[in-house]
């Protein structure tokens, strides 16, 4: 989300620099065209709210965790003499999407912690379309700034979201900016180059923190390379050798 009341997102006369704001979490307003959920607040309504003594009574959207306001101010915040602050593009017009958090069944499936912020890929793709449509209606170029991260996927550009971003980046007057993350030393990934001459299996240790009820891990390989795995519990119990086959599911129960 974004704190639209912050002066770094306003013009000199106090009017907003936000052309459109889609809050996917609020269902009491009018949804944007082509969508059936959330509430859209355009420039006129935001200005009405800013002129009011109680802006949130007119436009009730807020920044839940401060992340969106922080990023938007770095990218396009006005100059603030008192704090000696200036965003990268202080005269840019802004389009904002506040994503709704992922549904509980998805969080349960992927064993997402209750305190973790998590979004659905389809809502992200819907947000991209909203911003692209907004830019087209306003006749403006568009820089899509996406400061979200994930440790899932093959990281090879083949996911649906990756392909959609590629298509936006190929369009005239469209650019895509992705946050590179700040978890370089967290060791979330393991990679290995497998050759046909290998005679010994490759061992990868997964460190699970205390108090964790479970985790999800993904194994990616390139076709036609076929791999098999053996899972070894901390107590030394081993599963049989498992080959990956589409549509198959395996359940293993360890004693400890």
Task: Name what the model sees in each region.
Residues 19, 239-240:
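Generic structural signal for well-ordered beta-strand positions
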Residues 29-44, 240-256:
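Exoplasmic/lumenal beta-rich domain surfaces
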């Amino acid at each position: 989300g974004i704190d639209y009341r912050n002066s770094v997102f306003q013009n000199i006369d106090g009017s907003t620099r936000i052309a459109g704001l889609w809050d996917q979490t609020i269902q009491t307003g009018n949804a944007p065209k082509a969508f059936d959920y959330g509430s859209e607040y355009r420039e006129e309504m935001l200005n009405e709210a800013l002129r009011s003594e109680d802006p949130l009574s007119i436009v009730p959207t807020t920044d839940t965790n401060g992340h969106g306001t922080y990023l938007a101010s770095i990218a396009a915040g006005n100059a603030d003499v008192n704090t000696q602050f200036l965003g990268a593009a202080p005269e840019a017009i802004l389009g904002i999407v506040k994503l709704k958090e992922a549904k509980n069944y998805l969080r349960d499936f992927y064993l997402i912690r209750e305190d973790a912020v998590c979004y659905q890929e389809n809502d992200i793709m819907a947000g991209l379309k909203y911003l692209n449509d907004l830019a087209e209606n306003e006749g403006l170029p568009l820089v899509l700034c996406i400061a979200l991260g994930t440790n899932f996927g093959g990281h090879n550009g083949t996911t649906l979201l990756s392909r959609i971003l590629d298509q936006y980046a190929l369009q005239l007057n469209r650019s895509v900016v992705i946050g590179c993350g700040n978890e370089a030393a967290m060791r979330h990934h393991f990679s290995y180059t497998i050759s046909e001459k290998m005679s010994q299996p490759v061992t990868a240790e997964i460190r699970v923190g205390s108090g964790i009820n479970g985790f999800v891990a993904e194994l990616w390989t390139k076709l036609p390379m076929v791999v098999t795995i053996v899972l070894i519990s901390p107590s030394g119990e081993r599963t049989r050798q498992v080959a990956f086959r589409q549509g198959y599911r395996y359940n293993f129960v360890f004693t400890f």
